[in-house]
Amino acid sequence: MRLAGPLRIVALVVSVGLTWIVVSILLGGPGSGFPRIQQLFTSPESSVTAAPRARKYKCGLPQPCPEEHLAFRVVSGAANVIGPKICLEDKMLMSSVKDNVGRGLNIALVNGVSGELIEARAFDMWAGDVNDLLKFIRPLHEGTLVFVASYDDPATKMNEETRKLFSELGSRNAKELAFRDSWVFVGAKGVQNKSPFEQHVKNSKHTNKYEGWPEALEMEGCIPRRSTAS
């Protein structure tokens, strides 16, 4: 029974000694600050150098455009929920955020020499007046760039003259555009050939991504500026 007191003292000394050893390990030794404690709160991922992000150029293009070219991105609307976007030279010409898009055809007219926006409007092709669209695209000047993004329904109100005018701007698909198709297109007044910048997806219940609508389309590229001499 007389050994109980000394044993308690020995146990206390051993306990203090072990505590000191653990603290020393955590602190990393004298003069080393708190690196070991910091390691406990550092995730393995944070110690690995993050991979560099891929650089994005104007309008989010993965590569820069050549000199005297205009960078663009055109995105059609998704069903009747998400509005379209038209970006040129890193400037958003039309979008839901700008509150200048709507059901039907969203069209931005751009000066082919300067790249400056002339006018941007949305035309309701379900319940609107097609004559408003015709008045907009009939008097275009030579070299005017025409950016088009569909939203919901681009074609119900289209007539033969409308389809002919878009075909003259370089469209291959305007003549067959139908109810709720998805369509993005970049053309120009006075072009001799068909535009390389056009995408079209038919509305089909067998292939539609959404219930009643095909997938949204996204197109990007570089358009050569029109020279003042041409």
Curated annotation (Swiss-Prot):
Gene Ontology terms: cellular component: extracellular region
Start and end residues of each GG-type lectin domain: 68-226
Disulfide linkage: 59-87, 65-222
Localisation: Secreted
Coiled coil: none
Signal peptide range in chain numbering: 1-33
CDD domains: ILEI_FAM3C (cd13940)
Domain of life: Eukaryota
Xref: PANTHER family: UNCHARACTERIZED FAM3
Family: Belongs to the FAM3 family.
This protein's name: Protein FAM3A
Species in which this protein is naturally found: Pongo abelii (Sumatran orangutan)
